[in-house]
Amino acid sequence: SQLGRYRMRGMALMKKIPTFDDLVFLPGTLTRFVIEGYREKCETKTIIGPRCENPIELDIPVYITGMSFGALSYEAKTALARGATMAGSATCSGEGGMIPDERRYSEKWFYQCIQSRYGFNPHHAQLADGIEVFIGQGQKVGMGGHLMGQKVTDQVAEMRSLPAGIDQRSPARHPDWLGPDDLALKVQELRELTKNKVPIQLKLGAAKVYDDVRMAAKCDPDSIYLDGMEGSTGAGPHIAAANTGIPG
């Protein structure tokens, strides 16, 4: 109450939650065809948007998620773009628009459409290999973004058309839809913008997973991306980051 805002923090989840190291797997016996582990090929190639004219083909089912320029430095964004290309994977612009060098170094690149529309440019969207509609992220599901003023440099401010050095907040909801019917219209609008050449992906923070995924699927995206609560954030309310969401 003295600060007049949430107590903010960034980076990874601090509490201990289950990880992929805790997974166990059910082996095949009678009900599932058994394969020879040393002779059968393991295929990691992943295709996003096979219905599109230009689907995204990843060598591995992992890609660099959207992190904004501001939350990350120019050097970090471009280094991740180079690394993803070397790994046969993809990157995502995150909030705030396109860095030309990130696009140049990324062989496969998603352009993110976020609630605030900061830096969103339809011409840049047409340069992307895929469009990601940001609906939420795992560490602060149902909440908007917050970029601390000390990270809002002159270059970041110019890209977002906002003053430098001042905290920038993003709304929790997109301004042009109120429900799933409007989301379906937004997906169709982005298809028309990109002439149905590239995949449209929805990014959801994991919450009511079964119901949310069913509703998202009815909007006819090419892929649905669920973000777990350990997915980290540049800045978010500590109480929400520590105590809400579902482990990924």
Region roles according to the model:
Residues S1-V62, G66, A71-T85, S89-A90, ...:
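Conserved, well-structured core domains of diverse proteins
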Residues M67-F69, G96, I114-S116, G136-G138, ...:
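Active-site beta-loop-alpha junctions enriched in small/polar residues
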Residues A71, G138-V141, L162-S170, E230-I239:
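Conserved radical SAM core fold
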Residues Y74, T78, A87, D154-K197:
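Internal alpha/beta core interface subdomains
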Residues T91-G94, Y111, V133, L202, ...:
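General beta-strand structural signal in soluble alpha/beta enzymes
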Residues K108-F110, L147-V156, T233-G248:
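C-terminal helical cap(s) of enzyme catalytic domains, especially alpha/beta-barrels
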Residues H124-M148, Y210-D227:
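Carboxylate/His-rich catalytic cores and anion/metal-binding grooves
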Residues H174-G248:
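Glycine-rich phosphate/ribose-binding loops and adjacent secondary-structure elements
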